[in-house]
Structures are given as C-alpha cells and as structure tokens.
From Swiss-Prot:
Gene Ontology MF annotations: DNA-binding transcription activator activity, RNA polymerase II-specific; RNA polymerase II cis-regulatory region sequence-specific DNA binding
The name this protein goes by in its record: Nuclear respiratory factor 1
PTM section of the record: Phosphorylation enhances DNA binding.
Record gene name: Nrf1
Keywords per UniProt: Activator, DNA-binding, Nucleus, Transcription, Transcription regulation
Species the sequence originates in: Rattus norvegicus (Rat)
Domain of life: Eukaryota
Cellular compartment(s): Nucleus
Family: Belongs to the NRF1/Ewg family.
Amino acid sequence: VEQNWATLQGGEMTIQTTQASEATQAVASLAEAAVAASQEMQQGATVTMALN
C-alpha cells in the first residue's frame, strides 16, 4: 500500500512518499509552486489548482 502525505508548516511543503511515481512528482511540483506563489501574493488572493 502506497502511503504519502503532505505537511504544510510555516509555508514549507514537504512531500513524503514510499513510491516516487510520476504522478507523485507532479503533485509535489504543483504543491511547491502553489506554496511559493501564495507567499508572493497579497492576503485575500486566491490560488486555484486543477489536476486533469
């Protein structure tokens, strides 16, 4: 059983997984990008992330 979880603490995203699949890597990249973008945006702005 693959276990993966994300912890968001102090604006730092850490992805831990037992299997580094391409999908996991893609989600990790998107999560890191979202955190980086949110740190640059003003309060009240909205980040929308869509996965197809």
